[in-house]
Amino acid sequence: MSFDPQKFVDEISPQLKEIVDGRAIAAVSGGVDSTTAAVLSYKILGDKVIPVMIDTGFLRENEAENVKNMLKDLMPLQVIDEREKFISSLEGMSDAEEKRKKFRQLFYDTLSRIVKEFNAKYLIQGTIAADWVETQGGIKTQHNVLVQLGIDTEKEWGFKVVEPLADLYKDEVRALAKYLGLPRDIYNRQPFPGPGLLVRVVGKLTREKLEILRKVTTTVEKNLSELNLSQYFAVIFDSAAEYNKELSNEVGCDVKVYKTLATGVKGDVRAYGNIAGIECRKDYESLREIMEKLTSYNITHVVVKIKDKNPEGIYTIGIRAVNTQDFMTADFAKINWNILEKIANEINDKKIKEVVYDITTKPPATIEYE
């Protein structure tokens, strides 16, 4: 049965009115899920809802101001600057899961303070079905999944969590966003993880990697925005890698294995494995066969070289673009090489050694690297 946004709003309105009997903070990340949850709640509950966006330092360029301006006709969004607190607390951390957990702790500690400042009792957030399915399956910690994990938010942070979209999938959230009058730039927006660029600085977090990635993200999004892809973004990781003779012989082209690890999914559980880089450019179906062979080892992401940059560089930029119906499974996008080369040519930071393209499906990779 197809999703009916009007029916959903009619059903959720009395539930929200009954549950939320005091002031509520609506946490907005700028992604479609949290923004839709906030606008929906604000429409139903009015001034009881205070929409806030925490600038964690892991947002894209000018993101907080852009989102605030886009939403000004729908709700008043307050931006709270916590950049230094978040970056200094996470700097130097390498493990993907530890980074996500630390981010979650910081995020909810900050929200707890905001809830108290506004004398609120509730936190409205944009958890959707895919989030809690993944987290309960142990694939990765989605920072906004608390109730499903059995975390007592009232005891831990002093607020009750309200999740009006928890039974919806991404395509249904987009339909609801459109129905609620959100700008096209929001409902067609790229999914953006709660921890933002933190989980796209793969491996050790440094300020240098973060700032390079922020600039590169603008370049990648600008060039891929018209291709009708489900999700597309850039990652940065250390270029240190070793040539692997055994794997190279098996797939018939040069393979190197990076020292940086990335998250994947084997069966229904999280796997932490290597990133493999291949040097041969073939048609996408041949590349798919290579990817399938390589991921039968402890490899969770396979990337193919687009262009060498500065030989003295120490970072690799990975471009990831996928198509998917439900974000539970995904296929890599078959982007024209000329477009990928154009992007690589526009990426000019001297610390960048190479630009690569990710050719891994989900599974065995997760869409994000961490």
From Swiss-Prot:
GO MF term set: ATP binding; GMP synthase activity
HAMAP family: GMP_synthase_B
InterPro entries (UniProt xref): GMP_synth_C (IPR001674), GMP_synthase_B (IPR026598), GMPS_ATP_PPase_dom (IPR025777), NAD/GMP_synthase (IPR022310), Rossmann-like_a/b/a_fold (IPR014729)
Name of the featured protein: GMP synthase [glutamine-hydrolyzing] subunit B
Task of the protein: Catalyzes the synthesis of GMP from XMP.
Catalytic reactions of this protein: XMP + L-glutamine + ATP + H2O = GMP + L-glutamate + AMP + diphosphate + 2 H(+)
A Pfam family recorded for this sequence: NAD_synthase
EC nos: 6.3.5.2
Transmembrane segments: none
UniProt entry keywords in alphabetical sequence: ATP-binding, GMP biosynthesis, Ligase, Nucleotide-binding, Purine biosynthesis
Annotated ATP binding sites: S29, G30, G31, V32, D33, S34, T35
Top-level lineage group: Archaea
Domain GMPS ATP-PPase span(s) in chain numbering: 3-189
Biological or metabolic pathway of the protein: Purine metabolism; GMP biosynthesis; GMP from XMP (L-Gln route): step 1/1
Subunit relationships: Heterodimer composed of a glutamine amidotransferase subunit (A) and a GMP-binding subunit (B).
GO annotations of cellular component type: cytosol
